[in-house]
Amino acid sequence: MKTQIEIAREGTISSQMMAVAAEEHVSPDYVRQMVAEGKIVIPGNHSRKPRAVGIGKGLRTKVNASIGTSSDIIDYGAEVRKALAAQEAGADTLMELSVGGDLDRVRREVIAAVDLPVGNVPLYQAFCEAARKYGDPNKLDPEMLFDLIEKQCEDGMAFMAVHCGINLYTIERLKRQGYRYGGLVSKGGVSMVAWMMANRRENPLYEQFDRVTSILRKYDTVLSLGNGLRAGAIHDSSDRAQIQELLINCELAELGREMGCQMLVEGPGHVPLDEVEGNIQLQKRMSGGAPYYMLGPISTDVAPGFDHITAAIGAAQSSRYGADLICYITPAEHLALPNEEDVRQGVKAAKIAAYIGDMNKYPERGRERDKEMSKARRDLDWKKQFELALFPEDAKAIRASRTPEDEATCTMCGDFCASRGAGKLFAADLRGDKI
């Protein structure tokens, strides 16, 4: 069976492209053309047809939610509930990143529970199984890794983060660079670096990239090029090791497209605001416009407990400058495994950030809703305000918890409501839509 990019290059508009066009209010041929050029991807799988979600140029910024067990907390039911919570809160995609317990079981239960495109990181299970089998993750046999990639694709993975961009030269550059404030923060990245150093061998995912691509192409699983050397501190942002890996990933993105595979490129997780635009411009230029998947990014390192906010600030900037998919960050980041409420708060913060970014990325089509909300507030039209709200149930709950004496107003101002006062003074003028 053919991949979406191969279908698009033949001039055919698939049912998935049609669905994306309808959802995004763009023409089907636009979607087809961008898919053909590798500037839009539609995560999916021949063995499982998830909801059609387009990621890339000219489309709204999408939000990914990541869940998964840890070695300390293994609760399969909780992960399914978190997956459902993410879907209900508005996540566009989901990543199942378990490293504890029966990894086949949790992956399959999560995939069965949601209709979102689900992705994962195959290195996690590979190193977990090597540790269980041999007592040492560095004894991982590359054949086991490729077998796992195939098995996970068979299970229905719609996209897969694969750490292909770490090679021996990248590690040498990291060593020459020396000190890093945040060290290495990618579980998959540090595990692969450790394996390469222990075995004095090249990264098999880089060395046999054509094999990786061949497996994912077989299932039309999107290949998301992971960033194992991403900065884990804003003072490490855009350092030589990170940029070296990005350069390799951008080269691999071009190669993967030539092989008929849909390609994503992953971006960093900690970026000061003044570096966001340049980082995205660099990726877009070097990758030929491949969709960019930013992890956050967190914009300051000193707000644990509130990193859903620090990441939302960075994500809004990223969306504004061209990021196509952003990974949510929860309040539990750097502190604990997220629970259901953390997942909800993370998704909502990221959705708001994506919306704000899109308002500025697409001003001609992104601000009408805000104008209508302003008019509804001016007119004290509460029904309309809730209809326009990104999260109406949250807004309704807050208002209901503090009921005003006059239902036309709220308890913030009560008798001193500015909107009501201005309406009485300038009723005709303030309600003229031309103002």
UniProtKB/Swiss-Prot annotation:
As one GO molecular function, the record gives: lyase activity
Cofactor, free-text remark: Binds 1 [4Fe-4S] cluster per subunit. The cluster is coordinated with 3 cysteines and an exchangeable S-adenosyl-L-methionine.
The EC number on file is 4.1.99.23
User: Which keywords, in A-to-Z order, does the entry hold?
Assistant: 4Fe-4S, Cobalamin biosynthesis, Iron, Iron-sulfur, Lyase, Metal-binding, S-adenosyl-L-methionine, Zinc
Cofactor(s) recorded in Swiss-Prot or TrEMBL: [4Fe-4S] cluster
Amino-acid positions noted as binding Zn(2+) in the UniProt annotation, renumbered to this chain: H270, H334
The keyword Glycoprotein is annotated on this UniProt entry: no
Catalysed reactions listed for this entry: 5-amino-1-(5-phospho-beta-D-ribosyl)imidazole + AH2 + S-adenosyl-L-methionine = 5-hydroxybenzimidazole + 5'-deoxyadenosine + formate + L-methionine + A + NH4(+) + phosphate + 2 H(+)
**GO:BP terms for this protein?**
cobalamin biosynthetic process; thiamine biosynthetic process
InterPro entries per the UniProt record, alphabetical: ThiC/Bza_core_dom, ThiC/BzaA/B
Q: Which residues bind substrate?
A: M95, Y124, H163, S186, K187, G188, N227, G228, L229, R230, E266, Y293
Which positions bind [4Fe-4S] cluster? Answer: C410, C413, C417
Q: Name one GO cellular component term.
A: cytosol
The family assignment reads: Belongs to the ThiC family. 5-hydroxybenzimidazole synthase subfamily.
Q: Which PANTHER family match?
A: PHOSPHOMETHYLPYRIMIDINE SYNTHASE, CHLOROPLASTIC, THIAMINE BIOSYNTHESIS PROTEIN THIC
Kindly state the subunit structure of this protein.
Homodimer.
UniProt function note? Catalyzes the conversion of aminoimidazole ribotide (AIR) to 5-hydroxybenzimidazole (5-HBI) in a radical S-adenosyl-L-methionine (SAM)-dependent reaction. Is thus involved in the anaerobic biosynthesis of the benzimidazole lower axial ligand of the cobamide produced by G.metallireducens.
Name this polypeptide is given: 5-hydroxybenzimidazole synthase
This protein's species is Geobacter metallireducens (strain ATCC 53774 / DSM 7210 / GS-15)
Q: Which gene encodes it?
A: bzaF
